[in-house]
């Protein structure tokens, strides 16, 4: 077993060696290096064929038509293109958008930008387990609502939203429905022939593909229109201009192919490992599970350790690569906005750690992590005056703290 142990698979994943090997054939003179838009010679044709194969591999995993897959630079761009693209195209019908407070920053910040441009956005608060109440969603819909954006799996707590039910509601009311599936694709089954989802964002680097490549699913029947956000050459059927990075696209395709093949067995394995981790730490005093194990994605476990500061816990767990919150926001010392939206107080939100498991996580690593967490929590609480006061039965909320 090598230290440190990587338990931050929701931030990014290592590229699978099978993916890296395939990508290497699309970079140098010895391989296929042409521009897929070069239609006049073999170099371009071979590159175009490689892109077509990858497009099919991605479509196969999610039950889409390959013509519905638009390549982007990643899920952040896909979210931007979906939300701004649909809002701009359908704004004559209305200017109201609905999303949730626990979305990824790529969705929230895009909605904030649209507010500056004159759109109105309703941000729904989830229930304490992280799930959106469908009655709340229905109640928020107005005559001028044109777009609803709800993520499939939350990147911090792993809760799985009922996108099938939300999709039915949107379709019956003629509202465009966007889903950010970055954390669910390749881990949970997605079948877009059955789901009433109009736009769906994907990434490669969360399922053992390369960084810097993603895709947006844009439904053809009933046809959904979006306005391009990037111009210059009309690539990707006019929705996203720019030379296609063949090696990255091939990597994404191969990663999605492997995910389809291994998803069922791997999801079961990860569920088992996550349960082993939770069983190993749940008896520590004042430990709380954030999210919902029943409705949770198989790879994420978010836990709060009361009376322990999250940053100091991460320092003392230096042999475990874990995060507090998501990578996009964990550089700040603000408590997680996702946990705050679940109604959690700052102290508990500050003491939360996200463990995310993946393809290369072993039982041995989980057992080592359990032992290390027990030791670290014990040591940090010995140093904590708050813990001592709590043990003595002092109600910490009743104390008047003096501010310096």
Curated annotation (Swiss-Prot):
InterPro entries, sorted: Aminotrans_V_dom, Aminotrans_V_PyrdxlP_BS, Cys_deSase_IscS, Cysteine_dSase, PyrdxlP-dep_Trfase, PyrdxlP-dep_Trfase_major, PyrdxlP-dep_Trfase_small
Domain of life where this protein originates: Bacteria
Pathway note: Cofactor biosynthesis; iron-sulfur cluster biosynthesis
PROSITE patterns registered for this protein in UniProt: AA_TRANSFER_CLASS_5
Catalytic activity: (sulfur carrier)-H + L-cysteine = (sulfur carrier)-SH + L-alanine
Record flagged with keyword Iron-sulfur: yes
E.C. code: 2.8.1.7
Protein keywords: 2Fe-2S, Cytoplasm, Iron, Iron-sulfur, Metal-binding, Pyridoxal phosphate, Transferase
GO terms under cellular component: L-cysteine desulfurase complex
Cell membrane keyword on record: no
Subcellular location: Cytoplasm
A GO term, aspect molecular function: cysteine desulfurase activity
Short name of any one Pfam family annotated for the protein: Aminotran_5
Binding of pyridoxal 5'-phosphate, residues: 75-76, 155, 183, 203-205, 243
Residues carrying N6-(pyridoxal phosphate)lysine: 206
Cofactor(s) needed: pyridoxal 5'-phosphate
A biological process term (GO) from this entry: [2Fe-2S] cluster assembly
Active site annotation, chain numbering: 328 (cysteine persulfide intermediate)
Binding site for [2Fe-2S] cluster: 328
Family the UniProt entry places it in: Belongs to the class-V pyridoxal-phosphate-dependent aminotransferase family. NifS/IscS subfamily.
Function summary: Master enzyme that delivers sulfur to a number of partners involved in Fe-S cluster assembly, tRNA modification or cofactor biosynthesis. Catalyzes the removal of elemental sulfur atoms from cysteine to produce alanine. Functions as a sulfur delivery protein for Fe-S cluster synthesis onto IscU, an Fe-S scaffold assembly protein, as well as other S acceptor proteins.
HAMAP family documented for this protein: Cys_desulf_IscS (MF_00331)
Subunit text: Homodimer. Forms a heterotetramer with IscU, interacts with other sulfur acceptors.
Protein name per UniProt: Cysteine desulfurase IscS
Provenance organism: Photorhabdus laumondii subsp. laumondii (strain DSM 15139 / CIP 105565 / TT01)
Gene name for this UniProt entry: iscS
